[in-house]
Regions:
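Extended, solvent-exposed, non-transmembrane regions
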Residues: 1-182
Length: 182
């Protein structure tokens, strides 16, 4: 009996987590975790601020969402009118942390990461691109740094195959994943 191909959704997001090993061993359990089931759907989580021995945060939010791009074709899958891997999918994950402090020397007002994955056609790799990611209000020992993320690089090289080729060919922009200035 031949198994029917099916699309498996995967999307996970974590807010704040850590395992500090020195000078003391401290595990910070994941705060605000979202994980999609293999059927897709929506997972959201929020965490109100907490203070741990070495770090603290004011709030954390995560979201993982995955679905077929065409609702009618998704219904057709349930009636076995089409194969589940014949309908394009989009998976989006977001993690947003506000008011993050490490010891008393590093402070970040906003850390936001968003990734969007679009399923590839049969035999093609999935495209994964950043969208709306940011690091804002970063201060280290009182010195403010402005961080500019190199999203353009990851949008251009949005599959593992493209990224491997860029890294192997020594793309100059690959070495600059982010820039900071004070």
């Amino acid at each position: 009996m031949q198994m029917e191909r099916t699309f498996i959704f995967r999307g996970n997001a974590s807010g704040v987590a850590a395992h500090i090993r020195r000078p003391d061993d401290e595990v910070v359990p994941v705060q605000a975790a979202s994980s999609l089931p293999v059927i897709g759907g929506l997972s959201e989580s929020t965490a109100e601020g907490k203070k741990f021995k070495y770090l603290s945060f004011e709030s954390a939010f995560t979201r993982a969402h995955g679905d077929f791009d065409d609702a009618q074709k998704a219904i057709d899958i349930t009636w076995k009118k089409r194969a589940s891997d014949s309908v394009p999918t989009t998976t989006t994950v977001i993690s947003e942390v506000k008011g993050f402090t490490l010891l008393s020397s590093v402070r970040v007002e906003l850390i936001r990461a968003e990734m969007v994955a679009r399923s590839g056609k049969r035999g093609k790799q999935t495209s994964i691109r950043p969208r709306g990611s940011a690091i804002q209000g970063l201060t280290i020992e009182g010195a403010e740094l402005v961080v500019t993320l190199n999203d353009e690089f990851f949008c251009k090289y949005d599959t593992k195959e493209k990224l491997d080729k860029a890294m192997d060919s020594g793309q100059r922009s690959a070495a600059r994943l982010a820039a900071a200035k004070s």
